[in-house]
């Protein structure tokens, strides 16, 4: 390759690299931090996948980079223990925390849930670390463990209690709240006329089906799109 062609090739390569760098610099990195519900969200049809497709369709994919950081079985203290590697080191602009189902559910299934006071303590510790790095935060209430609308799901009481903890944290820490607990109940009241335990927004009382993923995507995007 002659010298002029080498210079032209180098110039084009540098231009492409610089343009790519500028595009990456302009993107808001959003990390979704949670348990198996978040882990499944990156799969086809999951709410992170749906959001990526929505961003592309709206021409907003140049503005956002979405990344899932969900691990099956995680509870609040698991998030605290792995947040350095899975969140902070990746330098996100926005973090969406969706946790709490296992903290309640595992009390019943294996006796390894999280007491309410410890749940709040670990949650606040996570918030403190994220704020220290000037990361924007939105937090979600745990949606459902059973979809019945007459408050006869066995763990409704605990889910409401932990959801209220999260609502209080959002208010006291001036954070964006994505109230999935309220959104799921409202949807089920309108659409679950047979008072079914599952099959409306979940496949198994907890994990999301197609309609559940769409609802979570819609509710999360309402908040993410408003974060500057």
Annotate each PLM feature.
Residues 2-6, 25, 52-62, 78-228:
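Alpha-helical cap/lid subdomain in secreted, periplasmic
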Residues 15-18, 47, 191, 216:
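Hydrophobic alpha-helical membrane context
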Residues 17-72, 77, 82-91:
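Serine-esterase "nucleophile elbow" of acetyl-processing enzymes
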Residues 1-27:
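Bacterial Sec-dependent N-terminal signal peptides
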């Amino acid at each position: 390759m002659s010298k002029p062609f080498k210079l032209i090739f180098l110039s084009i390569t540098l231009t492409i690299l610089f343009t790519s760098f500028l595009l990456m610099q302009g993107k808001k990195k959003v990390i979704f931090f949670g348990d198996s519900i978040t882990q499944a969200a990156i799969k086809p049809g999951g709410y992170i996948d749906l959001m990526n497709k929505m961003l592309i369709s709206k021409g907003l994919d140049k503005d956002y980079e979405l990344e899932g950081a969900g691990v099956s079985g995680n509870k609040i203290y698991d998030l605290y223990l792995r947040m350095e590697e899975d969140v902070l080191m990746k330098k996100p602009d926005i973090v969406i925390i969706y946790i709490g189902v296992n903290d309640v559910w595992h009390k019943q299934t294996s006796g390894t849930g999280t007491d309410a006071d410890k749940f709040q303590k670990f949650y606040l510790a996570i918030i403190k670390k994220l704020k220290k790095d000037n990361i924007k935060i939105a937090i979600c209430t745990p949606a459902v463990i059973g979809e019945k609308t007459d408050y006869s799901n066995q763990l409704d009481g605990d889910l409401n209690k932990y959801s209220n903890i999260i609502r209080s944290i959002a208010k006291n820490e001036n954070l964006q709240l994505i109230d999935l607990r309220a959104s799921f109940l409202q949807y089920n009241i309108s659409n679950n006329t047979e008072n079914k335990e599952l099959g409306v927004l979940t496949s198994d009382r907890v994990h999301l089906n197609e309609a559940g993923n769409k609802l979570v995507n819609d509710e999360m995007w309402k908040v993410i799109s408003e974060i500057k």
